[in-house]
């Protein structure tokens, strides 16, 4: 025989309160039974980067967050033992003719990487072209599988084509786009930013540029005004190849050049220039990065 128990008014109100609270929390996506998921801070994340005027360093810092480790490719390239293992490994570098700087290519070719999640973020200033596809193919040739490759539009520091004073005025929505990339990577999103359409002539031009343009000779590219140079050593400190040396009165340079223009942008006297520039008086450095940061990233001691 069933025995029916009557519910007191107090118990009924208590039960109703639990139901209402549960419904309210559910509408916000939270649960009364489980805490929201948190990012695992115990995961080891390595970020390898190449920077000239700070764009890629800024991005690398944002991707590293509080617990990631930043590693400068120019400071590592000469090491004999380049074996790296982590939960997550990332690469951040600028787009050079729809490819990576030569030093980045050399580093990836000679190093060994092991990680559960590998990603690349490529900064560019005007036209990314098929750089993500190039990165995917290049890394696969080296036995490296990217799970995520994306591009980020930023200030273009290429002085022969762009006026830096005009470039910095353009709203390229960098914070919003970068935040979206950071979220993608935290969530281990699988994505390659494929470029579907490109003129065959453009493809051929970029391929010839990649194969024949780099490395360059510093002597052919740079112009030095010895009258305004004060031998301060800034160019020597920011050059990823270590191509500069100081005399008592001025700088001297020679050797293979990445054409990153770090030296030209950083010179406090504007003594270093190129043969052709849109605005010889305008220079650029990412506002979130100091000159000291770039020196620490690139100086060849």
Across the structure, where does each feature detected by a protein language model lie?
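C-terminal segment of N-terminal export signals and the immediately downstream linker at the start
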Residues: 28-52, 58-66
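Helix-loop-strand module that forms the ligand-binding subsite of alpha/beta enzymes
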Residues: 74-154
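Iron-sulfur cluster-binding cysteine motifs and their immediate structural context
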Residues: 32, 37, 224, 230-258, ...
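Ferredoxin-type iron-sulfur electron-transfer modules and their immediate structural context
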Residues: 132, 148-230, 278-301
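N-terminal export signals
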Residues: 11-34
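Short gly/ser/thr-rich secondary-structure transition/capping motifs
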Residues: 69-76, 247
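N-terminal secretory signal peptides
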Residues: 1-7, 35
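Short, flexible loop segments at the rims of nucleotide/cofactor-binding pockets, characterized by
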Residues: 67-71, 94-98, 243
């Amino acid at each position: 025989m069933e025995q029916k128990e009557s519910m007191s008014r107090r118990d009924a109100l208590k039960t109703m309160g639990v139901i209402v609270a549960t419904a309210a929390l559910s509408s916000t996506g939270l649960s009364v039974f489980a805490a929201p998921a948190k990012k695992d801070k115990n995961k080891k994340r390595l970020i390898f980067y190449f920077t000239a005027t700070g764009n890629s360093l800024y991005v690398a810092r944002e991707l590293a967050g509080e617990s990631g480790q930043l590693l400068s490719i120019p400071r590592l390239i000469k090491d004999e033992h380049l074996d790296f293992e982590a939960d997550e490994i990332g690469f951040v570098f600028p787009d050079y003719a729809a490819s990576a700087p030569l030093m980045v290519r050399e580093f990836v070719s000679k190093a060994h990487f092991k990680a559960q999640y590998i990603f690349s973020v490529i900064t560019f200033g005007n036209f990314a072209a098929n750089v993500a596809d190039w990165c995917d193919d290049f890394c696969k040739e080296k036995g490296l599988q990217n799970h995520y490759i994306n591009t980020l539009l930023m200030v273009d520091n290429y002085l022969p084509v762009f006026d830096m004073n005009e470039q910095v005025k353009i709203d390229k929505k960098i914070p919003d786009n970068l935040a979206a990339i950071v979220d993608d990577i935290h969530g281990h999103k699988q994505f390659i930013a494929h470029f579907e359409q490109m003129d065959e002539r453009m493809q051929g031009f970029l391929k010839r540029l990649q194969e024949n343009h780099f490395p360059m000779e510093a002597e052919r590219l740079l112009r030095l005004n010895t009258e305004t140079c004060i031998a301060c050593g800034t160019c020597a400190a920011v050059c990823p190849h270590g191509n500069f040396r100081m005399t008592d009165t001025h700088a001297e340079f020679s050797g293979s050049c990445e054409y990153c223009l770090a030296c030209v942008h950083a010179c406090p006297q504007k003594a270093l220039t190129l043969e052709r520039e849109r605005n010889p008086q305008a220079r650029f450095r990412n506002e979130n990065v100091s000159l000291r940061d770039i020196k620490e990233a690139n100086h060849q001691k």
